[in-house]
Amino acid sequence: MGHLDLAALREEYARAGLDEADLAPDPIAMFDRWMGEAHDAIRHDANAMVLSTVGPDLAPSSRMLLLKGVAEDGFVFFTNTASLKGHELAANPRCSLLFPWHPLERQVRVDGVAAPLPRADVEAYFASRPRASQLGAWASHQSEVVSGRAELEAAYAAAEVRYPDQVPTPEEWGGYVVRPEVVEFWQGRTGRLHDRLRYRRTPGGWVTERLAP
C-alpha cells in the first residue's frame, strides 16, 4: 500500500477575513468571542488545545488538553502535576497554547507563563468532575510506565472500593492559569494571504500588530 500523497492535499480558505477593526480591546475579550463562535460551529471539544512545554534539557513536548476556564488574567486548565507537563512547568513555566478550529479556518496561539491555581480552586473543580473521572485520577500515575491496561483497571477497581462515596482530590492534582504575553489570531484567506493579528503585552498595555503570513 502506497503512501498518501500529502503534498497534493490542499484546501482553499475563503470563509471569512479578520481586519484590525474587528479586534476587541484586549485578547481575552477577543478570545471569548472566537471561542463562542467555535462552540456554536463545532460543539465537540471546541475547547481542546495543544499545550507545549519545554523541559530542563530544552526538548519540547506537546499534548492535547481541554481549556476549563478563561479569567481576566489568563487561560485555565487542570492536570496531574506529577506528569511530564507538570515537571516541565515546574522547571520552566513558559509555555504555549494552540487552539485549532479547522472548520472555521481559524487558530489562536497563546504564549505566556503558567502559574499554579489556589488549592481551593483545584478542589472545587475536581469536585465538579464525574465520579468516573475522579476515580481515574486516582488510578493513573500519569506519564509513568505501566505493565499493561490490566494494571490500570485494577488500580481503578481499587479506587472504587477505597472511595465508595465522595472522592477526595489527589495531592498531585492541580491547575494552572497561563498568563498571556502574546496572543495571535489567525484566519485563513485565499491565496495563502492569511490574516494574522497579534496582541503583544507591553508595560503600557496591549498593542496590536499585523504579521505577514
UniProtKB/Swiss-Prot annotation:
Top-level division of the source organism's lineage: Bacteria
Stretches that traverse the bilayer: none
Organism: Nocardioides sp. (strain ATCC BAA-499 / JS614)
GO biological process: pyridoxine biosynthetic process
Protein name in the entry: Pyridoxine/pyridoxamine 5'-phosphate oxidase
Self-association state and partner proteins as the record states: Homodimer.
Family matches, as Pfam families: PNP_phzG_C, PNPOx_N
Note describing how the cofactor binds: Binds 1 FMN per subunit.
Keyword Oxidoreductase in record: yes
Cofactor(s) for this UniProt protein: FMN
Keyword Flavoprotein: yes
Molecular function GO terms recorded: FMN binding; pyridoxamine phosphate oxidase activity
Free-text function comment from the UniProt entry: Catalyzes the oxidation of either pyridoxine 5'-phosphate (PNP) or pyridoxamine 5'-phosphate (PMP) into pyridoxal 5'-phosphate (PLP).
Binding site for FMN: 63-68, 78-79, 85, 107, 142-143, 186, 196
